[in-house]
Amino acid sequence: YNHTAEGNEFGPTLCFRGIDNAAYYRLVDDAKEHYYDTTGTGNSLLMRHPHVLQLIMDSLRYWVTEMHVDGFRFDPAAPRARPFHEVDKLSAFFDLIQQDPVISQVKLIAEPWDVGDGGYQVGNFPPLWTEWNGKYRDTVRDFWRGEPRTLGEFASRLTGSSDLYEHSGRKPIASINFVTAHDGFTLRDLVSYNDKRNEANGEDGHDGESHN
């Protein structure tokens, strides 16, 4: 629920752009013909508009009550915390989740970042949420590569990352520890290369993360 398939303002009209562009999408304040993009996909949904919030909540409830889905992963999740420009964990989206008798009872997993300013929000999501722990991922990668001064950080990540979650009263289960995912290096590439080698796929090395 962070973007639709239109891409940016030069893409085709495939979804809500043709219904009510200004209601469903975040537009640049002083240039409404352009999308404000914090997702890296060309557009971002307008998370303070009632129609957008209703769309999200209605569809989530449908998946739980009719399809018996027991949890959701939000990729990325930080755009849902941007009713305006800044990330706000008290935004309407999180309030609706917290108060909903159905959705508040299922698993909620956040990829806690986006490409906007201040978008890296690991450790800052509300109590109902678990988070992909990007600090665990980066620390384990550094440790495997023999980077200096990572042993203490490595121990902290293995024992629950209390520096990230304890301040909000959350327990170690709030952290989803991972090393690789569908974004960036595969596990084999991770232990084989320091830099990405994507030239052969036609993107000339511009796609994917460079970090290892």
Sequence positions of predicted segments:
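Conserved alpha/beta catalytic core and glycan-binding cleft of carbohydrate-active enzymes
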Residues: 68, 81-84, 89-212
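Substrate-binding/active-site clefts of carbohydrate-active enzymes
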Residues: 1-68, 73-99, 119, 164
